[in-house]
């Protein structure tokens, strides 16, 4: 509805009741009408003064702004036209440190505030009736709301609009955050190859060469891809042979010796520089030699390499000798010739097989479940190592050897004196783990590293009357495998000064976090009844990707 700013009184000139006792009514009405006209003229003159006074104030402020702008233009024109760089030196610091001009535009808002209320409207407001004094009941309310707002609330509609605008702004910010997170979680799309333009001339040239010499469409597409993305990398095109399937059903260990030699000869002829020369014979190691270097065929390359086996490698190396192997050195009776031949020619077992019962010649633990099978390894593979230092919680025990493929020490009982005499004197031979476990299998490593608790490892003895059985060590002398080793703490004791410093640092971080949260909350509290600020805030959120006040995401690293 239209808002009447100025009301001219009286509105009706002749609408007056004549008093009784007046004889000349026409003269009375004329005088009343003239008086009302004079009152209207006085109201017009008063409002004219207000209107022209407002116009004068606006013109004065406008002239002041124009004069200040003219003075700035005059100063700039003088400095531009009359500046002589030879006489007056300009420092680069003055030019760079000077702030750029920034105009301050004051928007007209809060037009209906008490301070900006015009005088005619103030007079009209004063004429209105006062609302009931409901503010007297405000101190007696528990919710803290003003009692008069339940009767009349001029800011109700503005508060409703403000709440809706702020909620829309927050919803848009959350949607942007979700979209950004979705873009981060989405996998990177491959680059699309642009489609080659349709060239009829190339097609006619391809047909002109004949069907035999015409290039295939796949070759043309490959050329276009090379032009767009650069030359393709070189891929290995070697044939897939038995060497590529070491762990499958076509393992080298499952082949006869004649086929194995033929396959190795072909590999040498394809790889070596001098293919006609025979391969070098394997080094002959005696019973006392240590650290032999086996010939290893890698399943990843299919080539012959002379390098030691590494248990951490991802390949499955197979030990193959190009010539018939020499007679093996004397072994303990735990590894018989039949078990050695079975380990050289049989296929490797699956990764986690059920523990098979040990053979008749192998060791067995009486009155306990059968332990894992012993390790079946070719002669000369295990590297004897010096005995490690025994832990302080266990009584001194015989030296323990360490296997090269398995990076764990297995405490077992030493061999009898009769078996030790046939081995090199300086380091004792490596005792062999239970049968059926491969050194490269992770299950074997876990089994060797953590033997079953409550079970003692079986002593490695040879069947015969001259080999006495050693009694198992008492339980008090054996440390359980599941119990971790306890070492004295070597960390320095934190003094009171350091603890106070750490506490101060924590408090400082907490204070900084709380301070930044208060700054973020202050940003929300600054939004008062300012329409321009609310609208500009919403526009900034819609058309920008910044999330300055996004639920304190920037202080998560302090937690």
From Swiss-Prot:
Tissues where this protein is expressed: Highly expressed in brain.
Entry's localization field: Cytoplasm, Cytoskeleton; Synapse; Cell junction, Focal adhesion
Domain of life: Eukaryota
UniProt xrefs under InterPro entries: SCAR/WAVE_fam, WH2_dom
Low complexity bias locations: 333-346
Keyword Ribonucleoprotein carried by entry: no
Keywords annotated in UniProt: Actin-binding, Cell junction, Cytoplasm, Cytoskeleton, Methylation, Phosphoprotein, Synapse
PROSITE patterns to which the protein is assigned, alphabetical: WH2 (PS51082)
Modification Phosphoserine occurs at: 489
One Pfam family here: WH2
One GO cellular component, as annotated: SCAR complex
Basic and acidic residues: compositionally biased ranges: 182-202
Assembly, per entry: Component of the WAVE1 complex composed of ABI2, CYFIP1 or CYFIP2, BRK1, NCKAP1 and WASF1/WAVE1. Within the complex, a heterodimer containing NCKAP1 and CYFIP1 interacts with a heterotrimer formed by WAVE1, ABI2 and BRK1. CYFIP2 binds to activated RAC1 which causes the complex to dissociate, releasing activated WASF1. The complex can also be activated by NCK1. Binds actin and the Arp2/3 complex. Interacts with BAIAP2. Interacts with SHANK3; the interaction mediates the association of SHANK3 with the WAVE1 complex. Interacts with ABI1 (via N-terminus).
Protein family per UniProt: Belongs to the SCAR/WAVE family.
Protein name in UniProt: Actin-binding protein WASF1
Organism of this sequence: Mus musculus (Mouse)
Lineage start: Eukaryota, Metazoa, Chordata, Craniata, Vertebrata
């Amino acid at each position: 509805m239209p808002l009447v700013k100025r009301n001219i009184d009286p509105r009706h000139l002749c609408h007056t009741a004549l008093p009784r006792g007046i004889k000349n009514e026409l003269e009375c009405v004329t005088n009343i009408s003239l008086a009302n006209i004079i009152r209207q003229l006085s109201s017009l003159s008063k409002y004219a003064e207000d209107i022209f006074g407002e116009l004068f104030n606006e013109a004065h402020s406008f002239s002041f702004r124009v004069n200040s702008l003219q003075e700035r233009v005059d100063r700039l024109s003088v400095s531009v036209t009359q500046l002589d760089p030879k006489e007056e030196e300009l420092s680069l610091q003055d030019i760079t440190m000077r702030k750029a001009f920034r105009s301050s535009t004051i928007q007209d808002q809060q037009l209906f505030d008490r301070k900006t209320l015009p005088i005619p409207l103030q007079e009209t407001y004063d004429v209105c009736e006062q609302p009931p004094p409901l503010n007297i009941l405000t101190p007696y309310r528990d919710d803290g709301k003003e009692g008069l707002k339940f009767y009349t609330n001029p800011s109700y509609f503005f508060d409703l609009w403000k709440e809706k605008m702020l909620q829309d702004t927050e919803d848009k910010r959350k949607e942007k955050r979700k979209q950004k997170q979705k873009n981060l979680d989405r996998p990177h799309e491959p680059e699309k190859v642009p489609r080659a333009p349709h060239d009829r001339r190339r097609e006619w040239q391809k047909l002109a060469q004949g069907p035999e010499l015409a290039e295939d469409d796949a070759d043309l597409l490959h050329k276009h891809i090379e032009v767009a993305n650069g030359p393709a990398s070189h891929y290995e095109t070697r044939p897939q042979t038995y060497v590529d399937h070491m762990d499958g059903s076509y393992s080298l260990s499952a082949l006869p010796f004649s086929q194995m030699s033929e396959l190795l000869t072909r590999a040498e002829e394809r790889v070596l520089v001098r293919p006609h020369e025979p391969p070098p014979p394997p080094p002959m190691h005696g019973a006392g030699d240590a650290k032999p270097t086996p010939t290893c065929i890698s399943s990843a390359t299919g080539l012959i390499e002379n390098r030691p086996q590494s248990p951490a490698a991802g390949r499955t190396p197979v030990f193959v000798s190009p010539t018939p192997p020499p007679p093996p050195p004397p072994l303990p009776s735990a590894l018989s010739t039949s078990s050695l031949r079975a380990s050289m020619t049989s296929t490797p077992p699956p990764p986690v097989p059920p523990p098979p019962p040990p053979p008749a010649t192998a060791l067995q633990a009486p009155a306990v479940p059968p332990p894992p099978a012993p390790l079946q390894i070719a002669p000369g593979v295990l590297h004897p190592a010096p005995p490690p230092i025994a832990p302080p919680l266990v009584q001194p025990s015989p030296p323990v050897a360490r296997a090269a493929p398995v990076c764990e020490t297995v405490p077992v009982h030493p061999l009898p004196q009769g078996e030790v005499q046939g081995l090199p004197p300086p380091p004792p031979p490596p005792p062999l783990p239970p049968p059926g476990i491969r050194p490269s299998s992770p299950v074997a490593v876990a089994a060797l590293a953590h033997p079953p608790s409550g079970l003692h490892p079986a002593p490695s003895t040879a069947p015969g009357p001259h080999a006495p059985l050693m009694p198992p060590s008492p339980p008090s002398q054996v440390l359980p495998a599941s119990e971790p080793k306890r070492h004295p703490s070597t960390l320095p004791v934190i003094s009171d000064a350091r603890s106070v410093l750490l506490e101060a640092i924590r408090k400082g971080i907490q204070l900084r976090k709380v301070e930044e949260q208060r700054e973020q909350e202050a940003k929300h509290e600054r939004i008062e009844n300012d329409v321009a600020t609310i609208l500009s805030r919403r526009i900034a959120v819609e058309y920008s990707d910044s999330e300055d006040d996004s639920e304190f995401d920037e202080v998560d690293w302090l937690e």
